[in-house]
Structures are given as structure tokens and as C-alpha cells.
Amino acid sequence: MQDIVVDPAAHNRAAWDKYVQEGNEWSRPVSAEDVERARMGDWSIVLIGREPVDRSWLPTDLTGKDVLCLASGGGQQGPILAAAGARVTVFDNSPRQLGQDQMVAARDGLELRTVLGDMRDLSAFGDATFDVVFHPVSNLFVPDLAPVWRECFRILRPGGTLLVGFLNPDVYLFDHEALDERGELIVVHKLPYSDVTQYSAEERATKFGADAPLEYSHTLTAQIGGQLAAGFVLTGLAEAPHQSNASAQYMSNYFATLAVKPG
């Protein structure tokens, strides 16, 4: 079933602005103490789940490195990387998410740039601008990934790295209500899944709320194969559970990849 909906970027911008107002987990800024520890070299950031990303996936010394936190607003990863010495740009679709980064930067005296936009269009940046793109779990909010990978490849310098977190697409097989409310794994959806094609606007409003963000599953071909097709070389793979999802006792809910732009 498919209905006419607003552009997903516009819809999800409003949804995430609301999440910030509600205090969503991924919209809670790091503390001043976290920033101070990062300045002293004691820091960690999350790419998938709640586990710190493997520090070997990032440059040993971040000082002077140009880092793009892609679809990564909320005042979490960007400020920590800036405190660790990187030149950070946070790019996000939600003004309020970016506002969290701006707040931390002002509070703690960090140099940090924020840019509003859709992750599929990075035309705000020139070719070979960044050394690292840090892209935590967020591409479930756009329907197509090929533009994301093409743009990431373009804006990275040769030898630059792309760190990506994404949902295991199998999570979308299951009935959301049965899973979230009763912990039951009931297969009801065909993959790849989309809120837009699976439910009408009225059904979405009933099941998730009219203001909930639109989500899209993506195949592993789109996630990993898409990076390879864009020109990246895959050098790392990790997985993690979803701490509050009943399916975690049977499978990993998150994957992470590390890829390099040759050169």
C-alpha cells in the first residue's frame, strides 16, 4: 500500500526536531565533563548500539584532521571529536539536532561547524575536503543510499576513511507492536521494508504516531555493495545488539563498516 506523502527529508526533519524537544536518547548532548576528558585524551564515541567505536578505526592523532559527522547531530560525537583535536563539521537534516552541537560548542569553547542538509546531497562541500566521515546509524531515514556513498567518496581525500553504522535489515521483518510491547518475533513484512509502502498515512499514524520519522530498510547489497560500487575498499566490519529490542537475543541488530578511499 502506498500513499502520497511529503518529501521524506522534510517529514523526518520535523520528526527529529520534535525528538529533540522530547529528549530523545540520541539528542542528549554530552556533558562539560565529557568534553574536558576528551581534551585530555580520554574519550569514546558510539557508531552502533551503545558500544564505543574501536579506536583503531580512527586516526591515532586527530589533531588537525578534517572530520565530517554525517547525519550525526545531537551534541554527542561532534563535540567529543572536536575536543580531541579534530576540525569537525556536523551535518544533519534537523536544525534542532544541530542546535545541540552548537550549544555544546558555545558552552565549552569548541571550534565546530554545523551545516543543515540532506545526507544524499553534500554539495555544500568541495571534492576531497575531509579525512574522515563518521556516519552513525541514520541512513534508515532516507529511501536511497547510492547518492550517500557517491557523495562520501567525492568529499573524502585519497586515503580517507568512512565509518558507517546501520541497522540489520532483518529487524524490519517483524511486527513492531508485537516486538516492542510483548517481545514477540512475528514475521509480517517483506524486505526491503518501507513505512511508506507498507502502511497508509492513517495506518502509520495509528501504529507509530503521525509525527514519527519515516524509516526504510536497506539490503546489505545497498549498504555494503553500495560502498564498494562507489569506489571504497572495505577494511573493517563489526556488529552489536540492540539493548532494548527482544530480537537481540537471536541476532545482531546493528552492523558497522570501515571503508577507505584508495589513493
Question: What kind of region is each of these model predictions?
Answer:
Residues 230-232, 246-263:
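Core SAM-dependent methyltransferase catalytic element
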Residues 161-202:
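Conserved class I S-adenosyl-L-methionine
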Residues 131-146:
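A short SAM/SAH-binding and catalytic strip from SAM-dependent methyltransferases
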Residues 146-161:
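A short glycine-rich, Lys/Arg-flanked "PGG" loop and its adjoining helix->strand segment in the class I
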Residues 65-121:
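Class I SAM-dependent methyltransferase SAM/SAH-binding core
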Residues 29-65:
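Conserved alpha-helix/loop element of class I SAM-dependent methyltransferases that forms part
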